[in-house]
Amino acid sequence: MISFKYIGKHGRLGNQMFQFAATVGIARKINKGFVFPKENTEIPSVEDFKDGVTREVYFDLPKYFPNVTMTLAPLDQIETNHVAQEPGFHFFPEFFAIPDQTNLMGYFQTEKYFEHCSDLILGFFQFDREIKKKAENALPKIPGNPELVSVHVRVGDYKALQQFHPVMDADYYFSAMMEFSDKDHNTDKYFVIFSDDIEYAKNLFGESEGIIYMENNEPEVDMCAMSMCHHNIIAN
């Protein structure tokens, strides 16, 4: 059995999705099972950064993706005799040779750890029905079925973490948007703006026919709505 005992203690939803997917992918590659601690969904942890910056984190995945709950077990029932620490932010194929009963540690931010079982991962990452319904209702209904490009402008928590997660500047967003605008002139495109600081985003992009702002949604609804767009411009 392969586990990630610290999931929910190092990183929020996006990081947890990579950590979960990598654990499943590595376990499947070596023909082992996988399991995650139930307690991490109930007890908050404090994530520490340099310079005294902290933030509270939970293991959020089961709350948004109900299928993840079938992978949970009490911590005292998860036996691990080995630890495999990710040495860096690149792909390390050596993880496909770890022994059974290994506890993984790291961020594992590459699909190479789980691309061989992508259908299984997508099965786990099916949003809760209520979240899906809210996302579908929140997305604009535009005649002619144009392509929707989500634009994620993340500002809030990154302001205090600039040395780790720089806020992307206007040049990044406008350059990315131009890539889509120039690619196919025969298809109408609308840019759907998602942000944790919508006033900042409005000052950045202004008002125009091709810009739509998503407001007053929970973060998980925004994420689900982003997944329903045809293309995505991410924040980091």
Question: Predicted regions span which residues?
Answer:
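A short, glycine/small-residue-rich beta-strand->loop->alpha-helix junction that serves as a flexible
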Residues: 8-18
